[in-house]
């Protein structure tokens, strides 16, 4: 529940109370068939099914009067299939060749209705009903070559070409969201001066697509003066990254990096020009640019303490010239400290280890937002017994409930707001693992569900 007091010159105080109740669940099923041949041939098929129903109740009151009493039902059904074939071959000259093709199809169905109680029970608002379907067709082919030139220099280069088309049907109206070709160059160069000094250059490119829910023209109220909207005009963004890495004594790492992301998108707020309401919506920016340096230092203290420290500093820049009658070009220098520790409390009978990890970030920018600092401390106590076949793990994440920005502030073109979020993501878990004989867990490619479900 949230309470707001709106003060206007010459007018009495108005108190608004809003209550939101949200429930939902999701189910994901995946089937993958893959053939790995001795000649370097790999072929297979993959199918994923996702289902997620949801329900929301929103009540907004002013004194004793109900302004809005709304119920919202939603449902998302996604079917995704893919076929792929890859082949790798190593020649006697030392050259290695890897190539393949991949084709995919996705169908995402989204249903949303809104029911309002105006004194005679909940009645559907037929003009707000959303019954949408998004169909995606994708195909790509890639070629990768690599070679070791003696004992000092090695190189890997690849190029992928992708075709992607997305058709959208909203309440019977058809449109095309995206229809384009994209090239993805990647390269890795490594030079070993000697085993104590190694230099590596990595260049990569990628593409990120918005979730199916975020391009749906839906509306989800947060409170009396805030709402989340979908953005059917949202575009995918490309990312280009470069890293120069120096490894000293096969132990210490120093790196410099740069990331350029045109059309980068993030959820940003803006003020509605027709009513007193803050609108949160995913928006494409002109670009995001980050560059900086970092260092990774591992160390040990006897057999008791094994640790790794990571320090990095970077400059962040995000720009958008046309943002709902505003524009922004925000820059910020930020730093990060991260430390991972493993303490061996006892090596045998009992075999006890304590993991204690933490990080601190000085702040960041996200579009029009200026984000405050955040930090996180998590730990895990592991007890191995029964000849190390059994493991009991007690884990606590986000111990101090601090892994969200301390403040989210906007001070732009006469618009000022400050948002505090309640961090309630602390989690304590207990798990038990038993290893049967010489069983080794097989490695499986994780299902990419990054575009499934709702993002709040």
Per-region residue spans from a language model:
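Outer-membrane beta-barrel signature, preferentially recognizing the C-terminal barrel domain
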Residues: 134, 207-256, 260-262, 278-292, ...
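Transmembrane beta-barrel architecture of outer membranes
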Residues: 26-30, 82, 138-140, 180-188, ...
């Amino acid at each position: 529940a949230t309470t707001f007091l709106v003060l206007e010159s010459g007018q009495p105080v108005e108190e608004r109370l809003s209550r939101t109740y949200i429930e939902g669940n999701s189910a994901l099923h995946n089937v993958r068939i893959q053939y790995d041949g001795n000649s370097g041939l790999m072929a297979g098929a993959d199918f994923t099914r996702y289902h997620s129903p949801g329900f929301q109740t929103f009540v907004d009151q002013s004194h004793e009067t109900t302004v809005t009493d709304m119920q919202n039902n939603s449902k998302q059904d996604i079917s995704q299939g893919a076929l792929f074939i890859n082949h790798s071959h190593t020649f006697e000259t030392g050259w290695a060749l890897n190539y393949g093709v991949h084709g995919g199809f996705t169908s995402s169905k989204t249903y949303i209705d809104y029911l309002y109680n105006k004194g005679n029970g909940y009645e559907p608002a037929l003009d707000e009903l959303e019954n949408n379907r998004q169909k995606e067709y994708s195909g790509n082919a890639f070629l990768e070559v690599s070679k070791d030139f003696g004992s000092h220099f090695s190189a890997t280069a690849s190029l992928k070409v992708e075709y992607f088309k997305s058709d959208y049907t909203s309440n019977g109206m058809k449109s095309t969201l995206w229809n384009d070709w994209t090239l993805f160059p990647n390269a890795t160069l490594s030079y070993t001066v000697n085993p104590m000094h190694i230099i590596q250059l990595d260049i990569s490119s990628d593409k990120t697509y918005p979730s199916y829910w975020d391009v749906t023209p839906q509306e989800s109220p947060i409170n009396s003066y805030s709402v989340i909207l979908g953005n059917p005009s949202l575009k995918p963004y490309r990312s280009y990254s470069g890293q120069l890495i120096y490894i000293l004594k096969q132990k210490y790492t120093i790196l410099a990096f740069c990331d350029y992301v045109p059309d980068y998108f993030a959820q940003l707020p803006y003020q509605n020009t027709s009513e007193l309401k803050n609108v949160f919506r995913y928006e494409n920016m002109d670009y995001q640019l980050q560059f900086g340096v970092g260092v990774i230092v591992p160390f040990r203290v006897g057999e008791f303490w094994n640790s790794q420290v990571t320090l990095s500093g970077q400059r962040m820049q995000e720009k958008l010239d046309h943002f709902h009658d505003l524009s922004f070009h925000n820059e910020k220098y930020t730093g990060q400290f991260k430390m991972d520790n493993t303490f061996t409390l006892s090596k045998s009978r009992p075999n006890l280890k304590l993991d204690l990890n933490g990080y601190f970030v000085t702040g960041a920018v996200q579009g029009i937002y200026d984000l405050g600092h955040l930090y996180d401390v998590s730990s895990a106590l592991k007890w191995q017994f029964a000849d190390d076949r059994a493991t009991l793990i007690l884990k606590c994440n986000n111990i101090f409930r601090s892994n969200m920005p301390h403040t989210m502030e906007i001070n732009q073109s006469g618009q000022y707001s400050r948002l505090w979020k309640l961090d309630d993501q602390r989690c304590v878990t207990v798990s038990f693992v038993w290893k049967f004989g010489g069983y080794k867990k097989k490695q499986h490619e994780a299902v990419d569900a990054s575009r499934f479900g709702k993002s709040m």
